[in-house]
Each structure stands twice: as structure tokens, then as C-alpha cells.
A protein has these predicted regions:
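Short, intrinsically disordered, charge-balanced linker/junction segments flanking boundaries
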Residues: 252-254
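A small/polar active-site loop signature that marks catalytic segments
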Residues: 75-250
């Protein structure tokens, strides 16, 4: 048999107005119907003396059948991570430019996973192999197969997420764009548009003028998002007066 990483719950998950320079870097990791490893992978660099070229030594995590291909032009210079990644977010070929601190070993530069669902299928296969369950067919992601080819499904295990207040805590405290986008898609049952409508309906029912906000995503990474100061003030006032909203929201602030 084979393992299928089913990512079909979400529709297109990269908001249309995210810029090309963001969608390959760690903060631009888009949601997936089957997210895994926070939809990011690490390139482990070794840097030398100031001005020398840094080299990629390893990747974590790795796929079982597909290898990353990284065109790297990273210089050992400065005191901070100033490396940036470009390329097709769904491709295993990446371009990395910029600089990282000199004289480092296993220095981590993060980028977006090309296919989180396939990696999840790979890692599940590895775990099954370790306990003696052997699979003789290559893994797939549901993006590449027709749903009709899956004849039947049997629920074998359910894993529950942390409660919503804990997810919100991490989202706000760490400014986690991936979590914010995933929450929006969950509200919209896989659709960015329907998620935005759900947010607007929530505040409209509480008396706010939703014509004062224009949302294109859940995190604010897109540059077209706009909100008036009046809407923000009224929203915070509503949260403050609602004990169910105020406690988890206030706890989540840095």
C-alpha cells in the first residue's frame, strides 16, 4: 500500500496579494490542509571568515524520495541573519542570497516547505517501517491524485489540537503568520474569502462598521490590508467588555 497526505480540506491557501519576496521565507509559510513542521524546513549553514562564502551542509527535515536543490550565494558577514529565500514556494529548487554571521556551524536559515502533506506521509511511513509495517508503493499528496481514487476511508486515530485560547496565545505572542492564516481558513472551512466574511460578520453583529476594514488575509502580511483607527478602538472596547473574549485575548498579548 501507500500513504496519502490528504491536504484537500483547504483551497488555495496563499493569499493573492502576498509578495514574491515573502512567500519562501519562514514568516511567509502558508497554511496547508495537512500542515507539518510548521510548514518550514531548515538549511544548516557553515560559515567561515568574514567575506567568505557560507555553505549549506544539511537540511532538516528531509523527504524520503525528493532532495532539495539550493542555489546559495550567502556571505559570512555581519552579526545577524540577513539571508533571504526566493523561488516557487511549491518547488524543491530554492535560491538563497544575503549574509549570515561568520564562523558558525549548523547555522539555521528557515524556508517554506514545498509540500508539507507529502513530508507528513514520508515521516509516517518511516515510523511504520520502524515497527515492521512495510509499504511498497511511493507516497503521495492528495494535490496530485483524484479524490475518486480513494475508494473508502476508515478512521483509525484522532489527534486533538490544543484549545483555541492556547492557539491564540501562541499566534499573538509569537506573531505567527501561519497560525493566523490557518485560523482564518478554519473559519472559512478552507476558503480565504469565506474566512474573511466570517470575521466581518462576527464584528458586524456586535455593532461595528465593517466598511472600515479591508482584509485580504488573516495575518496582515499582505500589503493591501487596511483598518481604521476608529474600528480598532471600537473592537478593543468590545473585547474589554466581553469576559469570554477579554481574558484569552489579554493573556495572548506580548
Amino acid at each position: 500500500g501507500k500513504i496519502i497526505g490528504d491536504a484537500s480540506y483547504f483551497n488555495k491557501s496563499i493569499p493573492a496579494n502576498w509578495i514574491w519576496g515573502d512567500i519562501n521565507n519562514y514568516f511567509g509559510a502558508a497554511p496547508c490542509g495537512l500542515s507539518f513542521y510548521d510548514n518550514k524546513f531548515k538549511m544548516l549553514y557553515s560559515s567561515g571568515s568574514i567575506g567568505s562564502k557560507a555553505e549549506v551542509k544539511n537540511y532538516k527535515p528531509q523527504y524520503s524520495t525528493i532532495q532539495y536543490s539550493v542555489n546559495s550565494n550567502v556571505i559570512s558577514k555581519g552579526t545577524e541573519d540577513d539571508a533571504y529565500v526566493t523561488g516557487d514556494p511549491f518547488s524543491f529548487v530554492k535560491d538563497v542570497n544575503g549574509k549570515i554571521p561568520p564562523n558558525k556551524t549548523n547555522y539555521e536559515v528557515e524556508a517554506v516547505l514545498p509540500d508539507p502533506a507529502l513530508l507528513c506521509a514520508d515521516k509516517l511511513t518511516e515510523s511504520l517501517n520502524k515497527i515492521g509495517v512495510k509499504l511498497n508503493r511511493q507516497n503521495f499528496c492528495s494535490n496530485y491524485i483524484k479524490p475518486d481514487s480513494v475508494v473508502s476511508k476508515l478512521l483509525m486515530f484522532t489527534h486533538y489540537s490544543p484549545t483555541l485560547d492556547k492557539i491564540v496565545y501562541h499566534t499573538n505572542l509569537k506573531s505567527n503568520n501561519l497560525y493566523a492564516e490557518t485560523i482564518l481558513l478554519a473559519l472559512g472551512k478552507g476558503s480565504i474569502y469565506m474566512g474573511i466574511e466570517a470575521v466581518k460578520n462576527f464584528w458586524q453583529k456586535r455593532g461595528l462598521d465593517v466598511s472600515e476594514i479591508y482584509m485580504t488575509d488573516g495575518s496582515g502580511l499582505g500589503r493591501a490590508n487596511t483598518v481604521t483607527t476608529n474600528f480598532q478602538a471600537n473592537m478593543l472596547a468590545k473585547i474589554y467588555k466581553d469576559s469570554l473574549l477579554y481574558k484569552p485575548f489579554n493573556h495572548s498579548l506580548p
